[in-house]
Amino acid sequence: MLHLDYTFNVSDATSTSSIIIVSRRELANLRIMVIIASAISIVFSLIAIFWRWSRRRTIREQFHIALFSVLFIRSIVQMIHPCLALSDPFFWAPKHRCFTIGFFLLVLVRMTDYWIFINILHNALLVLFPHVDTERRGLYRFRHTVFTLSFVIPLTIGGLAFTNKRNTFVNLQTRCYLPYTPVRFMFGLNWSFDYALSIAIIALQTCMFISIRRKIKRFKKYSHQQTNVFDTLNVIDSYPTAPDQVALPPFPDTNSTLTYTPSNSQSIYSSQSQPSPYSRPLLSSVHPNLPPGSQSTPANLNQSGIHFEQDFRDSPNRTNGLEDHTSFKLSSPLTSDEDGASSVLAAYGNDMQDDPLLKQRKRILSQSKFLFAYPAIFIFMWILPQIQIIVILAQPLHCSGSCKRFAFVAVFADNFVAIFIALSDFIWICYRGYTYLKERDSSKSYWDQIKELTLKWWRGKFGEEK
């Protein structure tokens, strides 16, 4: 059995921290496990970078590429020490070698945490402040500062590690890193950042989840209340009480044609006609492509006949709900104000129910459930090694059995960072593609649609319409 304790040797070697009591074979297996995990992380990082490289023009994808680039370099650095120590069961690293590997590993670990936080902060700003300019939302205006701080902050933390002049970085047999004692260096330069980032990420994701839920509920309430749909849109102040107060509804198709046929010599657009106090310039405000005269509302609707037609045959966005209203006519005179108002509201309500925006918001609501996937992964990666260290420090020299197996899992999780993040991205992309194919109205087979989406992704166009 090998007892890894604190032993201060000559100046040419670094001290080894007391981790667990392992045999030669267990130590070799532990190093092999770290090498395999780091190698897989390298592959997944390259796949993630290649996957997003075609969309690198957007600032969000640039942040993701920066994150996986750091993970790629970090995985390479993590492989160096166990590869050098694999042939020697009890490897004593020269001080300059362990200091170099430990310094760059600490810098890359902190840089990884920084880019994780930047990605989540950028997404949170996009969700919480959607009314800002589309091209300059999130952290776009501060992108140069963000990239500069990604080097300044980690390098500063790495430099602070040298304040521990006795054991700056120690040989932990699977890596060269900060010593476990004195605890202030491990807590100040490692644990404190993990705890702060965990709390900040959970807070941001919770705010995003609550904001999305509130917007979806508000939209559902608005779309289901057909009788109050005009009040919600701020189109009219109250319902009409007389036939001459009925205003034409703002139908959602901007390609529709309007035809007016006056029944007498007096034009309904005459300057002598006084608009109703209940009417507003509906059509021009909602549809700027309509003629200017259509925004006036006649006051003598009983005397003037109106022939109102809408033709949706040339509209590319026609839905099933709009097919029932392709020929909508109002003849003069109106029999009752209730019939006129109810027909207007019913037509508009059916159009709103079949609005593709409603389906889009339902899809966003279902996707919002995945917001906590990233915090769960980060907490899993950060908490396990910390619990392992706490248990070992509480029971020194007695970590065996289940404690040893837990320590192996903690070491595995600590070296599997890129795999966890890449798998989360891959699952998310598959889910988004599945919902896109499921809700898409197409006569093509699933296989043809998958090939079409793959071609879009290869050209960097998939997701732009989202």
UniProtKB/Swiss-Prot annotation:
Segments of this protein annotated with the region Disordered: 262-337
Compartments where located: Membrane
Biased composition (Low complexity): 262-285
Compositional bias of kind Basic and acidic residues: 308-327
Pfam family, any one: Git3
Protein family according to the UniProt entry: Belongs to the G-protein coupled receptor GPR1/git3 family.
UniProtKB keywords: G-protein coupled receptor, Membrane, Receptor, Transducer, Transmembrane, Transmembrane helix
Transmembrane segments: 30-50, 65-85, 101-121, 144-164, 192-212, 372-392, 409-429
Protein name in UniProt: Glucose receptor protein git3
Function comment: G protein-coupled receptor (GPCR) that senses glucose and signals via the heterotrimeric G protein alpha subunit gpa2 to activate adenylate cyclase and PKA signaling, and suppress sexual development and gluconeogenesis.
Biological process terms in GO annotation: adenylate cyclase-activating G protein-coupled receptor signaling pathway; adenylate cyclase-activating glucose-activated G protein-coupled receptor signaling pathway; negative regulation of induction of conjugation with cellular fusion
Subunit structure comment from the entry: Interacts with G protein alpha subunit gpa2; the interaction is direct and leads to activation of gpa2 upon glucose stimulation.
One Gene Ontology cellular component annotation held by this UniProt entry: plasma membrane
Classification via InterPro entries: Glucose_rcpt_Git3_N
Compositional bias annotation for Polar residues: 292-305
UniProt topology in membrane: Multi-pass membrane protein
MF-aspect GO terms: G protein-coupled glucose receptor activity; G protein-coupled receptor activity; guanyl-nucleotide exchange factor activity
